[in-house]
Amino acid sequence: MFRGVANLNLDTKGRMAMPSRYRDRLVETCEGRLVITVDRDGCLLVYPQPEWERIEQALMSRPNMDRQVRRLQRLLVGHATECELDGQGRILLPPPLRDYAGLDKRVVLVGQGNKFELWDEDTWVKSRDEWFKEEDETAEPSAVLESLSL
């Protein structure tokens, strides 16, 4: 389970040091092999490779005659890029993925259970604040969330 928020920096080559609290688990569970792809919210999704393979298999087993399925396959699988933690626990983020998410220097890594989201810091702060505001304005939880006692 990956949880928590970490503010990080990209170096001039586009590498990000994975926080040590995740590094050992990633080496144990997937030998440091990760898959990075795009998300419709403007961030990147970072999966341990075995978890990505499970998701990819499920997605690709759907009928691609369905327009939404086909689009999701194109976006997620089409942009999926394998990478590996180097000896210092860093991952190299490919330029096209950095460009998509607007990643330059300051980034935020957000644990999401089976994966991470990787955001440009300014975009993360703006989005997070908007979500809190929307939540305050809505005040009524969805039926799915009511049972969680959050």
Swiss-Prot record:
One of its GO terms (molecular function) is transcription cis-regulatory region binding. Residues 5-51, 80-123 form the SpoVT-AbrB domain. Keywords: Cytoplasm, DNA-binding, Repeat, Transcription, Transcription regulation. The keyword Transferase does not apply. It is found in: Cytoplasm, Nucleoid. One of its GO terms (biological process) is negative regulation of DNA-templated transcription initiation. It comes from the Bacteria. GO terms for cellular component: cytoplasm; nucleoid. Forms oligomers. Belongs to the MraZ family. This is Transcriptional regulator MraZ. The lineage of its organism: Bacteria, Pseudomonadati, Pseudomonadota, Gammaproteobacteria, Chromatiales. The gene is mraZ.
